[in-house]
Structures are given as C-alpha cells and as structure tokens.
Amino acid sequence: MQPLQQENIRLAATVMLIRDHPLGLQVYMVKRPGRGDFPDLHVFPGGKVDEDDWQPDLCPMLTDQEASARLGVAAGGLRYWVAVARECFEECGVLLANAAGGPVQLDAAQQASIGQSRQNLLQGNMSWVTVLQLSLIHI
C-alpha cells in the first residue's frame, strides 16, 4: 500500500444512520458489491466528495460555518454534508433531506418520482442538483 501523501488523499464522507427500536438501537449498513475495493464488506454509506458537492444553496438551513463546527473541521464542512446526503441517496435510496425546514412527507406519486430521479442519477442522466431542484427538497 502506498503511503499517504497530500497528492493522493481524497476527500470522503461517511455517515452512521442510527435509530431507536423497541429491541435496541439499529444501525444501517450496506453490503459492498463483490467487485472493486473492499468486496462484500458491510460498510456505512458514504464515499468521495465530488466537486458538485460544494454548493451552499443546496443547504439553505445550514451554513458552512455551522456544518464545519458540527463536524469538527476548520472549514468546508458543508461539502461533506452534501456528499453524505448524495452518497446515501445513490447507494441505498435513503434521502437525508427536509422541506421548508421540517420532515419530508411524500405521497406515493412523489415517492415514485424521486425513485425515478434516483435511477436517472445512477445512469448519469441527471445530476444530484437537478434531483433536489425537481423535488423541491433541501439537504
């Protein structure tokens, strides 16, 4: 394995999705495909930070300063926030978002539309920004 150096370090973000359950806490993990890096391992959702993840308008309820403070980084925390939301949606269909500052309530037609948007995103036919703009949802 090559030693870490400034030029080979990639920004990445991972999230632990945890919820209360009558039998105890539940932790959400995904199984990686049998090919590529870390085949067949169970991991937390996440991945590399894309250039498009640095878009403050995707998070109107959170500033970079606030995100950075919550994540314990000096600056640029908002790009990790956006990256983790995008990766969760891409990898497992979990949409970490809000609408007008509250929980997102989707009817069946909206769920189907967002599901189709996810397929378009995975096929490279739609950007993450477009998914959010079409659904009127914010991270």
Model-found features: residue ranges?
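Short, N-terminal intrinsically disordered low-complexity segments that are rich in Pro/Gly
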Residues: L4-Q5, A74
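Conserved N-terminal beta-strand and adjoining loop/helix that marks the start
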Residues: Q5-V27, G36-E51, Q55
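Residue-level signal for short segments within beta-strands and strand-turn junctions
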Residues: L17-R19, K31, N98
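Hydrophobic alpha-helical segments and their boundary regions
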Residues: M29, R35-G36, G77, N125
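A residue-level detector for conformationally permissive "hinge/kink" positions
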Residues: R32, F38-P39, A85, W128
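The catalytic Nudix box helix
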Residues: F44-G46, D52-L134
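Conserved small/polar residues in nucleotide/adenosyl-binding loops
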Residues: I137-I139
